[in-house]
Amino acid sequence: MTVPTPYEDLLRKIAEEGSHKDDRTGTGTTSLFGQQIRFDLNEGFPLLTTKKVHFHSVVGELLWFLQGDSNVKWLQDNNIRIWNEWADEDGELGPVYGVQWRSWPTPDGRHIDQISGALETLRNNPDSRRNIVSAWNVSELENMALPPCHLLFQLYVADGKLSCQLYQRSADMFLGVPFNIASYALLTHMFAQQAGLEVGEFIWTGGDCHIYDNHKEQVAEQLSREARPYPTLELNKAASMFEYSFDDITVSGYDPHPLIRGKVAV
């Protein structure tokens, strides 16, 4: 059976056709602009198999976002350390993703829960072309430990199926993007389940899609591996969008190649 490899195909394209660029971290990158990958969520859950992706961290970070949290303590308590490099001495990150998703501040002092609003729109006006959630709050960027990389997603319903498109302005193709793909695919399943819909596609759209210079060997190793079938997501329905737990979210049939380590560019 031929296994689709849209992520690996883009990774190879960037490695072969990308331009060399300097970057904020001083590491250097090979980069292409304006790329897209599509995943049919009915053909398996897109957790990459050409290297192991730490699914526990994917789940934990998404649950943390959905709680509107901005402190890494809950993540650390659950053995997730992916945000440690950016936290201050008190564990704070400022008004990052979850805060904007759940509590976007308005000029008149109110706060908007974008996730609840998106779910309400799916239930009551599924054909809306305005069902967008944004983490890119220009007025608060300077207070964030790291401005959002995956900054906006749009939900779309057709024929009873929910699709999601993400826009990611800055895409670390080796370390970050495999994680982001799994996270937003999971979020799409959760929205669909809570709204009584089936899943359709997850579409990942990237702006600056780059491979860091210190990841070139790891990318070559990953691209030498043969992809295996995606696993199956098993999602127990929670009472609400905000009451999912680790126990509700598992994958079966995940048989990846071994982990490939790489240094995060901070």
UniProtKB/Swiss-Prot annotation:
Transmembrane segments: none annotated. The active site is at 149 (nucleophile). The keyword Membrane does not apply. The keyword Transferase applies. HAMAP family: Thymidy_synth_bact. Homodimer. This is Thymidylate synthase. It comes from Corynebacterium glutamicum (strain ATCC 13032 / DSM 20300 / JCM 1318 / BCRC 11384 / CCUG 27702 / LMG 3730 / NBRC 12168 / NCIMB 10025 / NRRL B-2784 / 534). The gene is thyA.
